[in-house]
Amino acid sequence: MNRRRMAGLAAALMLMTFAPIHTHAALRRVPEGMKTEQGEWTTKSKKDKEKDEESWQQEMLDSVNAARKKAGVAPLELDKKVGKAAQLRANECKQSYDHTRPNGKKSKTALDDAGVSYSWWGENINEKQKTVQSTMQSWMESKGHKANILNEKYTKVGFGRAKDESGSYYWVQMFAKTK
């Protein structure tokens, strides 16, 4: 291999090492004998994925608590166990979009499965939205969903989302007054 190609290859490797996580293949002439493919290249670490999860959940929590504050209601606390139940429900909604679980049980049993001890509970589900903002807007425009978000009895909340093949999400908010 000549020096020019070696330098080019070294530069490409350095760029790939320090490039953003999401990048698209450049539309350039490919040297003879090399192949390329157009598309998205993603190499997210477990830490990056966890950060993404925390980021959208924090955005959802901020949005919920802003609505509650505007209504004069105390803020909710994000709870890991309630969140586990919400994520379970989001995955289930991807299979069967309903407040009844695929096993025929009520959605509240997801809280039981996650080890949550509660005296009050509620669930909001939403399908095909792509952002927290559009999902919250949809819920706030619905009397029943808005009532769950603003219910004074709830003290804890958890969120789940599951992505479908089209890139849209099934979103779940689970609310609880824990014992």
Tell what function each PLM region has.
Residues 48, 70-84, 97-109, 146-162:
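Surface-exposed patches in mature extracellular/periplasmic domains of secreted proteins
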Residues 5, 26, 31, 127-179:
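Disulfide-stabilized extracellular recognition modules
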Residues 1-8:
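Bacterial N-terminal signal peptides that target proteins for export
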Residues 9-16:
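Hydrophobic helical h-region of N-terminal Sec-dependent signal peptides
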Residues 35-95:
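A short alpha-helix/helix-coil micro-patch that ends at or immediately precedes a cysteine
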Residues 30, 84-133, 149:
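Short, surface-exposed glycine/acidic/tryptophan-bearing loops
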Residues 16-24:
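C-terminal segment of classical bacterial N-terminal signal peptides
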